[in-house]
């Protein structure tokens, strides 16, 4: 998802994908100016007018609704533009699980964190196109007011999760089962919530939503002309 103030961040993200010959991506342009800029540069993009607020707690229903519409067409892997692919992270996917999520130890949202001691980050998350997964989307989208999609998704999972449906796998991964949906939560290193780490597939540093993403990514060694 991209607005015009994120244009250079989007180009940096695509640069890293191109290094791994990844071409089956699409950036959702939320305004015509952004769409035209990306399209002129042969960057895969789709125009869906909308807005995402740069704060936690609300303003993210548009993203979740758009992901649901895309999910109807096939499996999707949603990735924030400041989550930089150092390796081909498609290798983290499998055919067994319905949702594969990156792990967040930052404490948001608090309800899920208190229950699980971690949360699932919407900044890198795979959804399989099947009825059970779409049913979760539909239940969350029944809420009429705007919301923070990471909060609503995590809260839905813990509200419907039985304690005996939490498993540990090798490499410190977690497996959850909710509503006949198998959720795999990756370990901290594979999608790393920190600065450049050569051991990681993806580095998704913790950056305040109001911060200048370009400046922060450069500081953290995740800009295309810094490595």
Task: Please provide the spans of the model-predicted regions.
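Short, hydrophobic beta-strand segments that form beta-sheet elements in well-ordered domains
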Residues: 24-31, 77, 184-187, 203
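Catalytic core and acceptor-binding pocket of nucleotide-sugar-dependent glycosyltransferases
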Residues: 127-227
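N-terminal anchoring/stem segment of glycosyltransferases
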Residues: 1-58, 69-73, 210
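GT-A fold catalytic core of metal-dependent nucleotide-sugar glycosyltransferases
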Residues: 47, 59-130, 134
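Short, charged, surface-exposed secondary-structure boundary motifs
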Residues: 10-11, 53-61, 108-115, 212-215
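Short loop/helix-cap segments at secondary-structure boundaries that form the rim of catalytic
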Residues: 35-41, 91-95, 195-197
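Short, polar loop motifs at secondary-structure junctions
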Residues: 29-35, 85-89, 189-192
């Amino acid at each position: 998802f991209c607005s015009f103030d994120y244009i250079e961040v989007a180009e940096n993200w695509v640069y890293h994908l191109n290094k791994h010959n990844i071409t089956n991506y699409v950036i959702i342009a939320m305004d015509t100016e952004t769409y035209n800029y990306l399209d002129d540069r042969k960057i895969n993009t789709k125009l869906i007018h909308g807005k995402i607020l740069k704060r936690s707690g609300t303003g993210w229903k548009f993203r979740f609704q758009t992901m649901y519409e895309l999910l109807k067409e096939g499996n999707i892997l949603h990735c924030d533009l400041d989550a930089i692919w150092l390796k081909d992270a498609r290798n983290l996917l499998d055919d067994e699980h319905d949702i594969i999520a990156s792990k967040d130890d930052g404490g948001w949202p608090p309800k899920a964190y208190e229950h699980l001691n971690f949360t699932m980050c919407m900044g890198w998350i795979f959804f399989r196109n099947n009825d059970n997964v779409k049913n979760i989307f539909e239940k969350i989208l029944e809420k009429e007011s705007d919301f923070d999609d990471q909060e609503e998704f995590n809260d839905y999972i813990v509200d419907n999760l039985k304690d005996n449906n939490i498993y540990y796998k090798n490499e410190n991964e977690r497996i959850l089962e909710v509503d006949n949906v198998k959720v795999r939560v990756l370990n901290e290193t594979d999608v790393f919530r920190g600065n450049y780490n050569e051991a990681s597939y993806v580095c998704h540093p913790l950056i305040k939503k109001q911060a200048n993403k370009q400046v922060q990514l450069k500081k953290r060694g995740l800009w295309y002309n810094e490595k």
